[in-house]
Amino acid sequence: KYIHMKKLMYAVLSVILCLSAGTGYAQKKAFTIADLYKIHNVGTPLISPDGRHIAFTLTDYNLPKGKAMTDIYVMDTDGSNLKQVTKNGKGNENPLWTSDSKGLYYVSSVSETDQIYLYTFSDRQSHKITNFSMGVNDPVLSPDNKLIAFSTEVYPECGADSKCNAKTDSLATNGPVQAYLADHLLFRHWTEYAAGKCSHILIYNIKNHTYTDVTPGEFVSPTFMLGGGIGYNFSPDSKELCYVSNHEAHPEATTNSDLFIVPVTGGQAVDITKDNKAWDGSPVYSQDGKYIAYRKQLIPGYESDLFRIALYNRQTGESKIITNSFNNWIDDLKWDADSKSIYFTGEVLGQEPVFKIDIASQAITPVSGDKSIFGFDLDRKGNLYYTASSVEKPVALYCMKASDNTKVKQLTSFNRELEERVDIRPADTIWVAGADGVKVEVFIVKPHDFDPNKKYPLIMNVHGGPQSQWMNSFRGDWQVYPGAGYVLAFCNPHGSTGYGQEYTREISGDWGGKPFEDLMKVTDALASLSYVDSTRMGAMGWSYGGYMMNWFQAQTKRFKCLASMMGLYDLRSEWGGTEELWFPDFDLKGQPWNSDLYKKFSPSEYVRNFATPTLIITGQLDFRIPYTQGIQYFTTLQTLGIPSRLIIFKNDGHWPNVVKSMPLYYDAHLDWFHKYLGGAPAPYNVEKMVKNQAFTNK
């Protein structure tokens, strides 16, 4: 349901691995948790206005210290002259080229709060630009290079007054009374309480050093995005800003976010999509100024409705959808320089390639070929720069002609040493007849040192969302478990994206129906594979995947053990504890008192069937699926005498911290699966990891 983990690519390495079925793999070591944190993650490329350079971020990890270090790099568009711009590893993000290509604005956490800095290539120095007390997020530079729009949490009564915000925040944070006050819902979201603050968009005047709150009042702007990038952009003449906001009286119960236009000097905002009662967002102006392209849904309250591209004509005020022929989700949008076409990424069959649509004819053309792409940019010569990965290849930066996807050049090789030393496993694909005979795509990753004459334990991983898809991308899950001797399988059952919107829609109102049937038929197919030990099969899942683990507990005894992360256990109490009520209201067809689905599909209603040992992981700050869901489940299993273990991450929400918490997450899984399925032991002692003693001598 959170849109969002994506994109990928594969090339020479897969060929080498295929040619060396036995000895090639044996010469490399098995992939471990430690190897996962040696991966260098390359961020989305940004082409300089003169077309000569690429800026991007690079994130590295320190596993023993639980730290992530992100810095900004620049290189020529042919991949030469690589230079590291920032060298402090202090969360340097969001690089933005100046209009003359002689500098980079970026956000850094080097000071107490995130602020904007300007790096100038002439003196190779960074200069602090903003000093707003509440910090800075997601900056956007105006085309005339004079303004920077950014989002920040402010107290509405203070608006753009930095000192007022600082004083108010200090009293609220440090005063003797520590309480939350709410007179309406959505008083908390994701991992944070509103606490009197809300997100506003401010515009910083670079010359005058002034801040203007262009979204004053009690409304959240930009509203919570359903993917698709930042929720605001400048017009080409730098005179107005288009942004997304939800002005409904009950935003917790509706997806009706609209696009608003406001002068950069502030003033009355105009709602340009008020006629659509579903979600509108991701605005991007055409370079000729005639249109605003944006992503649009049509079904109110349905956050997983098809994302379409619509065009708003700035002269006539009319909007029209131009992607009616594309029946899969659309994510990132970028206008071509001539304003005659739009490039976009779309989720298709376990991939996320780039497509191009001609706005006049509405003809859609594949651009990148079958790749899973995380982010992309274009230059004026028709070159496409993008980051991608595949199951067997970590993320890297690539370039190709947008008109010819047969000639791809890899521009970065930060992970080459790891790829040469460690056995990073590829994935096979099979299709299995699921519910109603509909084919389900299944990815299978075989274990390190695979011998087709042996039998191996299997782990099935079920994705969350539920409206999302597993993709042919690089993930720690896909390598850590095969590295420990398991066959890993992951599939896209009914409800997944990428296989047509009807396939996605069929999970709504049927959480434990067709998706469960799909997964059971996939389990049958996997159990029949000659190299799978059908007596040693386990399953794991996160969010809706965690719910499915709990549903497995209630409906089947096919698995020797389960691992449920951030999973729903009791659907009725979950409704009262979550924050985005539009989701269960739509997917479960109402509220607990007027929909029988809360009982029909709640694992808690089938306790008499429980028998399978289960690992439960949750986050104390998870407001999407409150950690009490995991506690209720653990209490039930313990009372029944069913082997179970509970891990609560104290400082995490729905997504545990990637380097502070996820190592324990992986290790706890390996420990649990080793106990019940017989794969390799976990590399670290779980109890010592919880006590921060696992790396004391390293």
Residue ranges and their predicted role:
Residues 1-28:
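Bacterial Sec-dependent N-terminal signal peptides
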Residues 46, 149-151, 178-183, 187-215, ...:
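Non-catalytic accessory segments flanking enzyme active sites
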Residues 49-50, 99-100, 143-144, 236-237, ...:
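Residue-level detector of Asp-centered blade-edge/turn motifs that repeat once per structural unit
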Residues 51-54, 101-105, 148, 241, ...:
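Hydrophobic beta-strand positions that form the internal "hydrophobic ladder"
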Residues 58-71, 86-92, 107-117, 131-137, ...:
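A flexible loop/linker signature enriched in serine peptidases of the S9 family
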Residues 76-80, 120-124, 205-209, 263-267, ...:
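Short loop/turn segments that connect beta-strands within beta-propeller blades
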Residues 406, 412-535, 542, 574-581:
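Cap/lid segment of the alpha/beta-hydrolase catalytic domain
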Residues 490-698:
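Active-site-proximal cap/loop segments of hydrolase catalytic domains
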